């Protein structure tokens, strides 16, 4: 069975005739029969059989999809649900590992056969790789069945997570790998890795465009997330819900997406920012409408962050279901660039994420069904109420022919194209970086793919000119 995680990487596209995908699947880095080493093939490995000392497996792969979210490459956050590989043990783990971009370490790992590298006539050039330092305070593995079983990770001296073609150390594909010291405990017994290279936790993954998050247009149509009775006991569904009766929302609490308006979310490839533009109509009084233009930046949740889980426990991987919250992407609101406006001109002033809960996006993230969607909880200003907020629950579908016409709103004081200089708690500063090299298909080199895309672009321009 092909095991996957997802790498969400918003890439800067500079001087290129094409746009790379903003999301990548990450699968276990399988051994290349010609250029690979003699051992490996799993996504995460405790070397020297250290895992068995506290009754956990030594080798793990992802159950379904995880997410590494980035604002353009400065920070990466790898999340996923791990299951033992080739072991009688069944204990699954929730993984969150955070990284920050760093300089080239003194110990760049070259695990492939010598002939794989450009210095010996091969195709793998380590000078093109990017490197990331682990953030221990935001990195943790926790057992889904025994929360007392916890693994923390820290930097292994002179090394870093390396990302690029051949960087996974197992094959010639685009990927990532890293070696980290760790401390593991099951609540009563603790083990800690030594400084030796044989006593580390090892991550080895392939990277490739995601069939789930990758939308060529970077634009998604949104609609009300209808309740799936097999997954939730909730009774009411709506696209927008106001928690208290508020004059700001015309004393209406339940809204559906408006017909006749463009209701979309769009992704900025240069920094990973998300923009939600939609119209909402009161379900009980169709004369009252609200148009919203909301801006978000990728968030960096802590290792202990708990997403909002509104479905039955049995719907989630931890309860035996198929929905994995570790596959979701998270965003924090940019209040200076966000606003909602009622059709009578009343402006809804957004003040932040309600109770520090981030916008969550992915399969089942809307809290109403198992579809690909999102939910978000936002505080707003109403002097007559205490801690007022509204939440949005919608399905999202890739738009093949997106429109750029968003619902009209009162323009905010500032229209930023990137997060503010001082981000809200959890916000990642937007720092565009050089593109990660795209994975070549089997039998093709990265350079041949680039040449093919350039040829296609030139032919397209020729055809347009000829028929003009």
Curated annotation (Swiss-Prot):
Coiled coil: none annotated. It is found in: Cell membrane. It comes from the Eukaryota. Induction: Down-regulated in grlA null cells at 16 hours of starvation. It is a lipid-anchor; GPI-anchor. Residues 445-468 form a propeptide. Keywords: Cell membrane, Glycoprotein, GPI-anchor, Lipoprotein, Membrane, Signal. Residues 1-19 form the signal peptide. Residues 409-421 have a biased composition (Pro residues). A lipid is attached at residue 444 (GPI-like-anchor amidated asparagine). The keyword Ligase does not apply. Residues 401-421 are annotated as: Disordered. Glycans are attached at residues 86, 334, 435. GO terms for cellular component: plasma membrane; side of membrane. This is Uncharacterized protein DDB_G0291392. It comes from Dictyostelium discoideum.
